[in-house]
Curated annotation (Swiss-Prot):
Homodimer. One of its GO terms (molecular function) is DNA binding. Binds to DNA and alters its conformation. May be involved in regulation of gene expression, nucleoid organization and DNA protection. HAMAP family: DNA_YbaB_EbfC. Residues 7-16 have a biased composition (Low complexity). Residues 1-36 are annotated as: Disordered. This is Nucleoid-associated protein Sca_0120. Belongs to the YbaB/EbfC family. Its main location: cytoplasm. Transmembrane segments: none annotated. It is found in: Cytoplasm, Nucleoid.
Length: 105
């Protein structure tokens, strides 16, 4: 049974890594990132779990004759916030998977 100890050690390391990643995932739900558009006239805040928790629209961004512009600004700010949430997740979880070749991490 050569190598059995190595396999057990590897399994322990994997369990430890899974625990740390689960802890990081839990922390991410409380982390917030902000995306903005229109020079900050529209701001969207999301958690690390990509839950939108706040939308702030400056009065200057509201033009009843150009609703489409406001929609575009909200969309752009939301996409930016979601991308920042992805980056935060990759950064936080990536430190636990360094050196491993795991697709999508």
């Amino acid at each position: 049974m050569r190598g059995g100890g190595n396999m057990q050690q590897m399994m322990k390391q994997m369990q430890k890594m899974q625990k740390k990643m689960a802890e990081e995932q839990e922390k991410l739900k409380d982390e917030k990132v902000e995306g903005s558009a229109g020079g900050g006239m529209v701001k969207v805040v999301v958690t690390g779990h990509k839950e939108v928790v706040d939308v702030v629209i400056d009065e200057e961004a509201v033009d009843p004759d150009d609703v489409e512009m406001l929609q575009d600004l909200v969309l752009a700010a939301t996409n930016e916030a979601m991308n920042k949430a992805d980056e935060l997740t990759s950064e936080r979880l990536g430190k636990h998977t360094k050196g491993l070749n795991i697709p999508g991490m």
